[in-house]
């Protein structure tokens, strides 16, 4: 809570245009709910984590996570598990929010080079647009698709002005430290800390290891 307060002071002094504020634990009771009028809510993949506090099922955790949804604020989320989708969409409906779900069908990996990935995105905002992320982490394709969709929602609502070329260049420059980060030959660092995250890491590492342990 102290760090969040300090962050708000820094944002204010720097006169930032947009703040990306990530919840620390869940959402419903998280300190970030001090922000009463966000311009957009984003919910990434929901998996079992912090079960002692958030609940021991995906559905219980989804209810906590959906607690960030505010009245008349659009929400962009990963639409994969039906039970989770139902909870998020119901919360959005109850709060008169437009909900935008990003599904596995929206994006397709064109080529994975190990150190970067080319993929295409096809939804209401992108028509098979191609992007490149500078990481071999396959799971980041989904995360990037979520971020790109969120950016377009912000553009649609008039919060930001974005040019297509600038978006493509920005995506290519993004780096995720501590997520499939190569720090030496054959040595990668990744902060996966729950079963789903570990499965995603294994999926990304497998093409690189080629059967080696």
Residues of each region from the PLM?
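General small-molecule cofactor/ligand-binding pocket signal
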Residues: 97-103, 181, 188
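Acidic-glycine-rich active-site phosphate/pyrophosphate-binding loop
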Residues: 111-128
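Conserved catalytic-core segment of NTP-binding enzymes
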Residues: 28-29, 35-96
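Nucleotide phosphate-binding/pyrophosphate-handling subdomain across enzymes
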Residues: 18-23, 30-42, 46-51, 60, ...
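ATP-dependent carboxylate-amine ligase catalytic core
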Residues: 1-36, 52-54, 83
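Active-site glycine/GP-rich loop and adjacent strand/helix microenvironment
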Residues: 80-82, 100, 118, 137
